[in-house]
Amino acid sequence: MHVTLVEINVHEDKVDEFIEVFRQNHLGSVQEEGNLRFDVLQDPEVNSRFYIYEAYKDEDAVAFHKTTPHYKTSVAKLESLMTGPRKKRLFNGLMP
């Protein structure tokens, strides 16, 4: 299992817009055949910080995800909402 934890920091006045943009990515991602989990989390202490927990069955599923319209649209719209680049950490999922 391929797991990615992504940290996304957005401008404080763009929080609602981020949530709507990412909702579309979430709804599309959970429909992908190789997707096992796609959680969107908001930091309770920093309202403009989000974490995305993505689990895919393998690298091929991740590669497919990055070709989807919902992913490409989301990434394009995120650039103007973020305070800096996304931070990604990769994990091997052992016990889901």
UniProtKB/Swiss-Prot annotation:
One of its GO terms (molecular function) is oxidoreductase activity. Its main location: cytoplasm. Its EC number is 5.3.1.32. Pfam families: ABM. It comes from the Bacteria. Keywords: Cytoplasm, Isomerase. It catalyses: (2S)-2-hydroxy-3,4-dioxopentyl phosphate = 3-hydroxy-2,4-dioxopentyl phosphate. Residues 2-91 form the ABM domain. One of its GO terms (cellular component) is cytosol. It is found in: Cytoplasm. Homodimer. PANTHER family: (4S)-4-HYDROXY-5-PHOSPHONOOXYPENTANE-2,3-DIONE ISOMERASE (PTHR33336:SF1), QUINOL MONOOXYGENASE YGIN-RELATED (PTHR33336). Belongs to the LsrG family. Involved in the degradation of phospho-AI-2, thereby terminating induction of the lsr operon and closing the AI-2 signaling cycle. Catalyzes the conversion of (4S)-4-hydroxy-5-phosphonooxypentane-2,3-dione (P-DPD) to 3-hydroxy-5-phosphonooxypentane-2,4-dione (P-HPD). NCBIfam families: PRK10486.1 (NF007791). This is (4S)-4-hydroxy-5-phosphonooxypentane-2,3-dione isomerase. It comes from Escherichia coli O9:H4 (strain HS).
